[in-house]
């Protein structure tokens, strides 16, 4: 473990942009090394105090849906090489689960999420900020496939949510946050050149830590 603080790489982008694929490609390349993924999706606010009818109204694409205070606290703990207990979100109950996931600190932290660049406090903790930029048509197709297959949603409900919530929130919050990125990656996980560049950069960081 290095003596300096860990390096934080932020990977943002709209839902279905391919940011998770970019994150996984980078992480898989460094399996066995000192690297971890911290997903903003795990940090939706606890809503156990609300009745189910209120939880069902949750706008998961709005900045206020996230417990960024807890995310920042956990990120600061990891930067101090302290273990955290990552929360788990239950999408069937629309609230935080009682389950937690212990996460050990690593030398490289990949922070991934749709709105991580929207919060200046999170941006201040990142060393490298990436935005995965993908065509809107491809993003909605990917989101439909994910929500129908993994979350038991109907096609009509996914389309309705996209038109009334996802697209407006993307245009209002996610797209404008792109200006805070150091690097914009078009074509998401298919952009192997950009991924290779990031792999090379991270390899250099890890090598420097080993030589400290």
Curated annotation (Swiss-Prot):
GO BP terms in the entry: CTP salvage; UMP salvage
UniProt enzyme class: transferase
CDD domains per UniProt: UMPK (cd02023)
Family matches, as Pfam families: PRK
A single Gene Ontology CC term: cytoplasm
Known pathway: Pyrimidine metabolism; CTP biosynthesis via salvage pathway; CTP from cytidine: step 1/3; Pyrimidine metabolism; UMP biosynthesis via salvage pathway; UMP from uridine: step 1/1
Catalytic activity: uridine + ATP = UMP + ADP + H(+); cytidine + ATP = CMP + ADP + H(+)
Gene Ontology molecular function, alphabetical: ATP binding; cytidine kinase activity; uridine kinase activity
Enzyme Commission number, as recorded: 2.7.1.48
Compartments, as annotated in UniProt: Cytoplasm
Chief location category: cytoplasm
Keywords of this entry: ATP-binding, Cytoplasm, Kinase, Nucleotide-binding, Transferase
Binding site for ATP: 13-20
Record HAMAP family: Uridine_kinase
Similarity remark: Belongs to the uridine kinase family.
Protein name as catalogued: Uridine kinase
Gene: udk
């Amino acid at each position: 473990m290095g003596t300096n603080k860990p390096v934080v790489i932020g990977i943002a982008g709209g839902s279905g942009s391919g940011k998770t694929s970019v994150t996984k490609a980078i992480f898989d390349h460094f399996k066995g090394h000192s690297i971890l993924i911290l997903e903003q999706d795990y940090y939706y606010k606890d809503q156990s105090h609300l009745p189910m009818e209120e939880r069902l109204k949750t706008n998961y694409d709005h900045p206020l849906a996230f417990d960024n205070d807890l995310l920042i606290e956990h990120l600061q703990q990891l930067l101090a090489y302290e273990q955290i207990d990552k929360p788990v979100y239950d999408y069937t109950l629309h609230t935080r689960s009682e389950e937690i996931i212990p996460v050990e600190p690593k030398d490289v932290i990949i922070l991934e999420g749709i709105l991580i660049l929207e919060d200046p406090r999170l941006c201040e903790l990142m060393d490298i900020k990436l935005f995965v930029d993908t065509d809107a048509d491809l993003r909605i197709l990917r989101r439909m496939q994910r929500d129908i297959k993994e979350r038991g949603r109907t096609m009509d409900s996914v389309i309705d949510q996209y038109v009334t919530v996802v697209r407006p929130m993307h245009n209002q919050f996610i797209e404008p946050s792109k200006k805070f990125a150091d690097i914009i990656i078009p074509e998401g996980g298919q952009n192997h050149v950009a991924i290779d560049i990031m792999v090379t950069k991270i390899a250099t960081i890890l090598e420097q830590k080993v030589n400290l």
